[in-house]
């Protein structure tokens, strides 16, 4: 039995949409909750890896959610611009809200790194799907 990737995504689109909203809220909660006694500034620390990982997951989730609700592929512009604007928006909110958090350029850099890693994974998954469809159509 062969599984159609797009059919599977569209069949579970309500669940996928819910997971996307949950992922978005977790990122907002994690980045906007009141700050703790973490070290002020280090280039490579746990916080930066969390930023990269969260934005990698969020970009991948954006692409999959887009496919669940739109029959065509997500535009690369959407998969690049939306996460980057989300990350910059979070940093602006950290500077405005009274959460004892402060905006950092390095957070934006690691958000962008995670965005591009998520984009690469999304494109790789699409390529694998396209190749398997080509093989299926040849036989």
Question: Which residues does each PLM region occupy?
Answer:
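Bulky hydrophobic segments
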Residues: 1-106, 112-139
């Amino acid at each position: 039995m062969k599984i159609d990737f797009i059919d599977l995504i569209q069949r579970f689109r309500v669940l996928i949409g819910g997971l996307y909203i949950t992922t978005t809220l977790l990122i907002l909660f994690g980045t906007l909750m009141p700050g703790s006694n973490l070290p002020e500034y280090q280039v490579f620390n746990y916080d930066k890896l969390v930023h990269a990982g969260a934005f990698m997951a969020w970009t991948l989730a954006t692409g999959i959610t887009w496919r669940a609700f739109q029959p065509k592929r997500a535009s690369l512009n959407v998969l690049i611009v939306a996460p980057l604007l989300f990350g910059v928006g979070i940093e602006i909110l950290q500077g405005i809200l009274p959460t004892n958090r402060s905006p950092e350029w390095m957070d934006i850099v690691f958000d962008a790194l995670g965005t591009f890693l998520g984009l690469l994974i999304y494109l790789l998954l699409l390529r694998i799907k396209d190749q398997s469809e080509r093989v299926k159509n040849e036989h």
